[in-house]
Every structure is written in structure tokens, then in C-alpha cells.
UniProtKB/Swiss-Prot annotation:
It comes from Dickeya chrysanthemi (Pectobacterium chrysanthemi). This is Type II secretion system protein C. InterPro entries: PDZ_sf, T2SS_GspC_N, T2SS_protein-GspC. It is found in: Cell inner membrane. Residues 1-16 are cytoplasmic. Disulfide bonds: none annotated.
Length: 272
């Protein structure tokens, strides 16, 4: 069929063809509008969040395995029961205990230790001078040390008792009496008073030799705020005061009673 021989389309035919095409497009648009408006909205599809399962067990590390077993848990407080205390050997360290200050709060207790004619004040969990030994407990008449993996006892009279060899009984007895007569704790008991973790002074009470305590004018539960000019409310100055007590035989206590302060002079070391 030869297209060139077809008769040309008249303008009326062309207009008619264009009209039908426009009508077809119009009907298509109407159908799409009806489809969107007439039908209900699709319900949202519930989303499911998938997360990997969490491990319920702790991961195993190399530190969990030991070649020789696990050592027992350390006693952080340093407290030992009565049976352990009674079986502890005396310390072999070249130290002497010259005084102790024990309060209700064991963490605030102070031990005064002498080494090479020097005085040091140490508390619980602190190392003693000259040795890799730590204080784990402070008692009224002794301290317990931890040295090279074992516990040892350093008593107030260790030095005299250990030097008994070559000393006569009379000389040893004289040394012990002299030591006992110059121990400040025989006259006054100091107990630190804490408030909001701050040192407010030391509560005073009579020691075994209570006559001297009351004779100088002290009363039960007096609050000491200074000793020989050192502020007992400052922990560093309080430690210095405790260190010096072993070398002095008289001191001035500043006590606070009923809101008033007064200085009380006390001398010890002689026969009471």
C-alpha cells in the first residue's frame, strides 16, 4: 500500500481525532481521582524492630583464670577477731610503740611510733616508717601490723620485754614502772569527735589514774580543742601534738565547756 497515494486528512477529521484523544486523557484522570478518593486509606503496616539478642553472661577474660587459685578477699577494715588477736606473734621490727589514741571511730585512731629516736603518728591503713608494713588495727595497748604477708603485734612494752635478756628483774621492773608512769594515756583518754567528716576536737575522759584527771580540774567528756598551742581540730596539728606527747611530762590543754574555753595545766611522770 502506497501511503503517498492516501488522500490528505481534512481539518475536520484532524479536529475530531484530537478531540477523542483529549477525551481519553480526561477519562483516565477522572478514573485516577476516583480511585484515590473513593477507596479507604491503607492501614499502616506495623513495624517490627529486630535487635540482636543481648548476652546474659559476662564475657570471659584471661584475668578470670589463675594458675595457683584465687587468694581470699582482703579485709579492708583491718578488723581481726579475738581468736586471731590472741595468736599473733610479737613484731620483730625495730620499732617501739610510745602511745595510742583510740576513739569510737577506729579509722581516726592514732598510734605514736618511735624509730631511731624519732616520733611518728600513724593511723589505720598507713605504713609505718622505715618498713613496708601497714597498720591494720589500733588497740588501747597495741597495734597490729601487716608485714610481708603476715600479721604482727607491736605492744606498748615490746621494747622492754624484748630486752629482758641481760637485764636483771629489778632493772626490768624499774623500766616498766617508769614507762607506765610516763604514759599519758594512764591519766587522760582521748577520743576524736567527728561531725560531717570533720574533726571538732577530742573528748576527754579519765584514764586508769583518774585522781590526777579530776585534781587538775578536768571533767568527764570535756572537749579538748588545743594541746600545747596546737589546734586539735586540725588533723595535721593533732598528729603533731600526739607525736610530742611521748617526749613531754607537762602540757596545757585548752578545753571547751558550756561554750567557754579555759586552759588547764597538767603534769605527769612523777608519783601520783
Amino acid at each position: 500500500m502506497n501511503i503517498s497515494k492516501l488522500p490528505p486528512l481534512s481539518p475536520s477529521v484532524i479536529r475530531r481525532i484530537l478531540f477523542y484523544l483529549l477525551m481519553l486523557l480526561f477519562c483516565q484522570q477522572l478514573a485516577m481521582i476516583f480511585w484515590r478518593v473513593g477507596l479507604p486509606d491503607n492501614s499502616p503496616v506495623a513495624s517490627v524492630q529486630i535487635t540482636p539478642a543481648q548476652a546474659r553472661q559476662q564475657p570471659v577474660t584471661l584475668n578470670d583464670f589463675t594458675l595457683f587459685g584465687v587468694s581470699p578477699e582482703k579485709n579492708r577494715s583491718g578488723a581481726l577477731d579475738a581468736s586471731q588477736m590472741s595468736n599473733l606473734p610479737p613484731s620483730t621490727l625495730n620499732l617501739s610503740l610510745t602511745g595510742v589514741m583510740v576513739g569510737d571511730d577506729t579509722a581516726r585512731s592514732i598510734a605514736i611510733i618511735s624509730k631511731d629516736n624519732e616520733q611518728f603518728s600513724r593511723g589505720v591503713n598507713e605504713e609505718v616508717p622505715g618498713y613496708n608494713a601497714k597498720i591494720v588495727s589500733i588497740r588501747p595497748d597495741k597495734v597490729v601490723l601487716q608485714y610481708q604477708g603476715r600479721y604482727e603485734v607491736l605492744g606498748l612494752y615490746n621494747q622492754e620485754e624484748n630486752s629482758a635478756d641481760g637485764v636483771s628483774g629489778a632493772q626490768l621492773n624499774e623500766q616498766l614502772q617508769q614507762r607506765a608512769s610516763t604514759t599519758m594515756s594512764d591519766y587522760v583518754s582521748f577520743s576524736p569527735v567527728m561531725n560531717d567528716n570533720k574533726l571538732h576536737g577530742y573528748r576527754l575522759n579519765p584514764g586508769p589514774k583518774s585522781d590526777s584527771f579530776y585534781r587538775v580540774g578536768l571533767q568527764d567528756n570535756d572537749m579538748a580543742v588545743a594541746l600545747n598551742g596546737l589546734d586539735l581540730r586540725d588533723e595535721e596539728q593533732a598528729k603533731k601534738a600526739m607525736e610530742r606527747m611521748a617526749d613531754v611530762h607537762n602540757f596545757t590543754l585548752t578545753v571547751e565547756r558550756d561554750g567557754q574555753r579555759q586552759d588547764i595545766y597538767m603534769e605527769f611522770g612523777g608519783d601520783e
